[in-house]
Amino acid sequence: MKVECASNIGFCFGVRRAINILEKTASERGGVETLGALVHNQQVLNRLSGMGVRVVKNIDDISGRTVAISSHGVGPAVLAELKSKGLEIVDTTCPFVKRAQVAAKRFHDAGFFTVIYGDVNHPEVKGILGWAGGNGLATLNPQGLDDIPDLSRYIGVLSQTTQIPTGFTSFVKNVIDQALVKDAEIRIADTLCHDIRDRQAAALELAGRVDLMLVIGGHNSANTRHLLDLCKTVSNTHLIETASELQTDWLKGVSRIGITSGASTDETTISEVCSYLDRLSAGA
């Protein structure tokens, strides 16, 4: 049984940057609170907790004088409230998310209605909507804007950073088809994360060459679920968070296994899965 990892695996640039910032802050100050989970990966959060990083869900729960913004970012109203309380803000927002926030603000300032291709319940999308100044919406409806009445003639379109590129492209085409009949002006911002795009392409290529594909990452991680959906289109694929979730009956008749991971999956977890597979292979 041969195991091969995708060429783009482990922490993405934005997650690694956020973790480095938090580790440094926690070390210097003996701990730090984050407004919301830094990433959607429990193993990483457990390790950070051991370093004194505490997750708070609401601003009123903050007990210290320093608070970290997660890699998913927040809207301007949240930032203003934190500043009004005199809190020192450590911003770990992913640069790609920041770029999407800037695009939404630019649309708003130009008088455009912002349409985000993304999950309205995801913290990243909530933050981006905040930068649209209340003049926007988020949807994953592949048909575009069919269900939205009285749409503005001025429309700015962008994407949640971790969405699948082909999905965003299809969405944009549908928006254009619907909006042009209304004599609309449309602006499109490419806010997809380059790292995630490369990761998805590498995973898809590997999935096409193996009998079984394993995606390692948090079950509540958006980018991990997108990897799962992509790989399932070409190979038998399962999502696991740790090696303990791997089921041996998946391996029956399998000679080649491919591995990819979500952007917030740490190298230790990946190594544990690979080691477990090696032991199973040796005992076969």
Curated annotation (Swiss-Prot):
Gene3D superfamilies: 3.40.50.11270, 4-hydroxy-3-methylbut-2-enyl diphosphate reductase, catalytic domain. GO terms for biological process: dimethylallyl diphosphate biosynthetic process; isopentenyl diphosphate biosynthetic process, methylerythritol 4-phosphate pathway; terpenoid biosynthetic process. Pathway: Isoprenoid biosynthesis; dimethylallyl diphosphate biosynthesis; dimethylallyl diphosphate from (2E)-4-hydroxy-3-methylbutenyl diphosphate: step 1/1; Isoprenoid biosynthesis; isopentenyl diphosphate biosynthesis via DXP pathway; isopentenyl diphosphate from 1-deoxy-D-xylulose 5-phosphate: step 6/6. [4Fe-4S] cluster binds at C12, C94, C193. Dimethylallyl diphosphate binds at H40, H72, H122, S221, N223, S264. It catalyses: isopentenyl diphosphate + 2 oxidized [2Fe-2S]-[ferredoxin] + H2O = (2E)-4-hydroxy-3-methylbut-2-enyl diphosphate + 2 reduced [2Fe-2S]-[ferredoxin] + 2 H(+); dimethylallyl diphosphate + 2 oxidized [2Fe-2S]-[ferredoxin] + H2O = (2E)-4-hydroxy-3-methylbut-2-enyl diphosphate + 2 reduced [2Fe-2S]-[ferredoxin] + 2 H(+). One of its GO terms (molecular function) is 4 iron, 4 sulfur cluster binding. Isopentenyl diphosphate binds at H40, H72, H122, S221, N223, S264. The keyword 4Fe-4S applies. Its cofactor is [4Fe-4S] cluster. The keyword Lipid metabolism does not apply. (2E)-4-hydroxy-3-methylbut-2-enyl diphosphate binds at H40, H72, H122, T161, S221, N223, S264. Keywords: 4Fe-4S, Iron, Iron-sulfur, Isoprene biosynthesis, Metal-binding, Oxidoreductase. Its EC number is 1.17.7.4. Pfam families: LYTB. The active site is at E124 (proton donor). Binds 1 [4Fe-4S] cluster per subunit. Belongs to the IspH family. Catalyzes the conversion of 1-hydroxy-2-methyl-2-(E)-butenyl 4-diphosphate (HMBPP) into a mixture of isopentenyl diphosphate (IPP) and dimethylallyl diphosphate (DMAPP). Acts in the terminal step of the DOXP/MEP pathway for isoprenoid precursor biosynthesis. This is 4-hydroxy-3-methylbut-2-enyl diphosphate reductase. It comes from Dehalococcoides mccartyi (strain CBDB1).
